[in-house]
């Protein structure tokens, strides 16, 4: 959700902080602020809205020369997105500043107690209790000791950073169920919510774990647990290319990431296809799947849609009963679980608060855990032990595209691996699907090369459109859901996805000439039925757009426009049918002049429950 960044070293901190916040914009935010410590004490600048507003305010004041600083982009949870609620927040003296990503669940109780002690509050945020708590414990103690004494009173999930004009040669960071990475430099050190903020400055990083804090100086990073005990931790080398966080000539990151999907599929498949004795190489323990009775998949948002496809694949290919649950509901309506149950957590970032909380609850009940994530070093990776790395690379656009495709590929590999272990599919059928997977990148490149200009022109026709409906059947029903989600996320057009057969059970009442219907109709066992459902919409004057092959006469006759896809084995079609829907959503939103990469109210990594 929120983005936090910090610097301590010999340089002026301000340029690093501003650049770092820009690299965290993809996380979503509604205000921003910076605090630096220098010879004149603590300097604080905050602004509502985008970072350019903060930069304008910074340009209007004397530039800070402080060499220690923290920065924050806020996604509002407690208190409206106003400047007085923006971080950093200070204590009564104005000499100690705090930023936080997360939620302090017991803030109301703490706030009441602090008010009784005479503390005055200037915001409605939960974070403001933290600097006051620290200040109350500073007398006769080090900054680290005061922070630790305050942290043990907090309940919730949070990452915190603290600077003080009275301790100008250090800063303190704390992690409890919210992401925080520390970067190691030469004569300087850094921290951030995520790697993109620091990847241009260092390749040596350390991911802070839950229940840990760190004291950063120019020359040292000390790691402690919440009791104050010193811990030994070793930085790891970061294998990242800084160009991943650049647009490289594309208008938006989202468009760049759509075009990166062929390469992502190749990377996700690389070295994972074996021979007849072991056609899939996922590096997972054989015990994970022994005597397996049932699978539950937990996810949120786009990952939930990928999981619906995964359910279909696992049941179709491996014959294992599989259910997909919203992570936010799983803990409160827990299904029957036992030692022969596998729970799969799916999260692009590996830091999704609801997903990790659900996995933690499932783990306590003795189930087997597997993670599917783009960030194996994340909290999810540490929690599950066994995981499939989707290898999609950094995704900056808030609306997931290439990470969705990579999750689909991961589910294909998992389902085929289970089918091989259980003997539910012939070796020939498994090889047939694997060959088809390997051909998909070139087919997607063909879609991108031939359809971009056409979809750009098609988007012009929806300037005044207020509603869309997407329909599909079978394993393309989740793609209809994903197409609707992409459109509503970035264009702010109301869009819904339905099983095509459900149109006549209610949604058909919404149809008229002003409501376009996008139908996914590819040759296979539900092709004719999907076309029949599309005809029902056409009879109500709805404009029909088909995601279908161009060389199918029935499709050409049915649809007003076609977003063409190649004919492939039906089981492989979701990876192809989603691409035109991503392009359609992108070009409609871009034509409307919207912020495609940072849609309003959304965050890339939803770290709070």
Curated annotation (Swiss-Prot):
Domain SIS: 285-424, 458-599
Major subcellular site: cytoplasm
Free-text function comment from the UniProt entry: Catalyzes the first step in hexosamine metabolism, converting fructose-6P into glucosamine-6P using glutamine as a nitrogen source.
PROSITE patterns named in the record: GATASE_TYPE_2, SIS
Protein location: Cytoplasm
Name of protein: Glutamine--fructose-6-phosphate aminotransferase [isomerizing]
Lineage of origin: Bacteria, Bacillati, Cyanobacteriota, Cyanophyceae, Gloeobacterales
Species of provenance: Gloeobacter violaceus (strain ATCC 29082 / PCC 7421)
Pfam families noted in UniProt: GATase_6, SIS
GO annotation (BP), single: carbohydrate metabolic process
Reaction catalysis annotation: D-fructose 6-phosphate + L-glutamine = D-glucosamine 6-phosphate + L-glutamate
Record key words, sorted: Aminotransferase, Cytoplasm, Glutamine amidotransferase, Repeat, Transferase
Active site: 2, 604
GO terms for MF: carbohydrate derivative binding; glutamine-fructose-6-phosphate transaminase (isomerizing) activity
């Amino acid at each position: 959700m929120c983005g936090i960044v910090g610097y301590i070293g010999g340089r002026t901190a301000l340029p690093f902080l501003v650049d770092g916040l820009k690299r965290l914009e993809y996380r979503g935010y509604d205000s921003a602020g910076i605090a630096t410590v220098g010879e004149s004490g603590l300097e604080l600048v905050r602004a509502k809205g985008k970072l350019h507003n903060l930069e304008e305010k910074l340009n209007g004041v004397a530039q800070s020369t402080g060499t220690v600083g923290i920065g924050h982009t806020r996604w509002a949870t407690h208190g409206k997105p106003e400047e007085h609620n923006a971080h950093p927040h200070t204590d009564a003296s104005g000499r100690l500043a705090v930023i936080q990503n997360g939620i302090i669940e017991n803030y109301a109780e703490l706030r009441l107690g602090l008010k009784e002690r005479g503390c005055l509050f200037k915001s409605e945020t939960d974070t403001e209790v933290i600097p006051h708590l620290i200040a109350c414990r500073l007398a006769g103690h080090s900054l680290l000791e005061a922070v630790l004494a305050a942290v043990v009173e907090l309940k919730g999930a949070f990452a915190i950073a603290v600077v003080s004009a009275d301790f100008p040669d250090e800063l303190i960071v704390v992690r409890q169920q919210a992401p925080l990475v520390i970067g190691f430099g030469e004569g300087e050190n850094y921290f951030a919510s995520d790697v993109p903020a620091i990847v241009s400055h260092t390749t040596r990083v350390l991911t802070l774990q839950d229940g840990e804090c760190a004291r950063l100086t120019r020359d040292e990073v000390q790691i402690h647990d919440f009791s104050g005990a010193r811990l030994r931790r070793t930085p790891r080398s970061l294998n990242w290319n800084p160009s991943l966080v650049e647009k490289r000539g594309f208008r938006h990151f989202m468009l760049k990431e759509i075009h990166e999907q062929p390469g992502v599929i190749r990377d996700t498949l690389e070295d994972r296809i074996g021979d007849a004795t072991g056609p899939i190489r996922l590096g997972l323990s054989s015990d994970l799947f022994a005597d397996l009775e049932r699978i539950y998949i937990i996810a949120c948002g786009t990952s939930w849609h990928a999981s619906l496809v995964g359910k279909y694949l696992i049941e179709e290919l491996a014959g294992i009963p599989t259910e997909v649950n919203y992570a936010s509901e799983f803990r409160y309506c827990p299904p029957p679980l036992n030692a022969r149950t596998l729970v799969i957590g799916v999260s692009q970032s590996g830091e999704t608060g609801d997903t990790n909380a659900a996995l933690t609850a499932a783990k306590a009940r003795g189930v087997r855990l597997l993670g599917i994530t783009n960030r194996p070093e994340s909290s999810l990776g540490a929690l599950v032990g066994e995981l499939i790395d989707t290898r999609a690379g950094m995704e900056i656009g808030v609306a997931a595209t290439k990470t969705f495709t990579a999750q689909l590929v991961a589910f294909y590999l998992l389902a085929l691996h289970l089918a091989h272990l259980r003997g539910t599919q012939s070796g020939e059928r498994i090889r047939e699907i694997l060959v088809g997977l390997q051909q998909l990148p070139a087919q997607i490149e063909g879609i991108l090369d031939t359809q971009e200009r056409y979809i750009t022109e098609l988007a012009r026709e929806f300037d005044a459109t207020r509603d869309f409906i997407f329909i599909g059947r079978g394993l393309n029903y989740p793609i209809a859901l994903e197409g609707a989600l992409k459109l509503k996320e970035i264009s702010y057009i109301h869009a819904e996805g339905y099983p095509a057969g459900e149109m006549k059970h209610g949604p058909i009442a919404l149809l008229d000439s002003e409501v376009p219907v996008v139908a996914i109709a590819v040759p296979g066992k539900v092709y004719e039925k999907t076309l029949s459902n599309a005809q029902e919409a056409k009879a109500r004057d709805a404009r029909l757009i088909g995601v279908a092959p161009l060389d199918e006469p029935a499709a050409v006759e049915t649809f007003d426009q076609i977003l063409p896809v190649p004919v492939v084995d039906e089981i492989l079609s979701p990876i192809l049918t989603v691409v035109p829907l991503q392009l359609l959503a992108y070009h409609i939103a871009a034509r409307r002049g919207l912020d495609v990469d940072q849609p309003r109210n959304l965050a890339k990594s939803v770290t709070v429950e």
